[in-house]
Regions:
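Short metal-binding segments enriched for Cys and/or His
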Residues: 75-86
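Short, intrinsically disordered, charge-biased short linear motifs at domain edges
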Residues: 29-37
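Post-signal-peptide N-terminal segment of Sec-exported extracytoplasmic proteins
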Residues: 37-70, 75
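N-terminal targeting pre-sequences for secretion and organelle import
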Residues: 150-175
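Sec-dependent bacterial lipoprotein signal peptides
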Residues: 1-22
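Thiol/selenol-based redox catalytic cores and closely related redox-interacting motifs
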Residues: 91-156
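Bacterial signal peptide processing site
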Residues: 24-27
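Short, charged, surface-exposed secondary-structure boundary motifs
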Residues: 81, 103-105, 163-167
């Protein structure tokens, strides 16, 4: 009889340990919407100081130990994050999924992890000053925009300061 209780208690302890580990994993990184991340009319871009809601297109946010920093575009956010002093793994990067939002009014319910996003650079779409990076969770949606409005599909690891600088120079000539 004691053996049965001993085995049952070991099994129960194992199950409880698994549940605790699963709960810890889920609490570690909530989606942007669950974290309460939203853009408000008075929010200013962390880089340029402009009012974020004054511009169409996707926005960006970096969430880390130092709080939340909001940006008027994914390009502004990535330009900031690519600086050596800001390029940290513990910073969560969010952008609007433009496959699920209207260009003129991105929906904060559709913020996605920038590390998994597809970006279209070089399109004819207008956004905040400088480089326009349209962000998508779905490759097909990104490819569709690139076909219809021009541009090239990239992943986060394809984007660096040099690319942002070159695209910014080209963008200022065409505006």
């Amino acid at each position: 009889m004691n053996r049965v209780y001993f085995k049952a208690s070991r099994v129960l302890a194992g199950v409880l340990m698994c549940l605790a580990l699963v709960a810890c994993d889920k609490a570690q990184s909530p989606p942007a919407a669950q974290a309460g991340l939203a853009f408000h009319p008075g929010d200013e871009c962390h880089v340029c100081g402009m009012v974020i809601s004054d511009f169409p297109g996707p926005k960006g946010a970096a969430v880390g130990a130092g709080g939340t920093k909001k940006f008027c575009s994914p390009a502004e956010m990535l330009g900031w994050w690519l600086q050596p002093e800001n390029h940290r793994a513990d910073v969560k990067l969010y952008v609007h999924d433009m496959g699920r939002s209207h260009w003129d009014a991105p929906d904060d319910a559709h913020l996605i992890d920038a590390r998994t996003a597809y970006f279209v650079i070089g399109s004819r779409l207008k956004g905040a000053m400088g480089v326009v990076l349209a962000s998508f969770s779905d490759l097909e949606a990104a490819q569709k925009l690139a076909r219809e409005a021009g541009g090239k599909v990239l992943r986060l690891e394809d984007i660096d300061q040099k690319l942002l600088g070159q695209a910014g120079a080209m963008s200022s000539m065409s505006h």
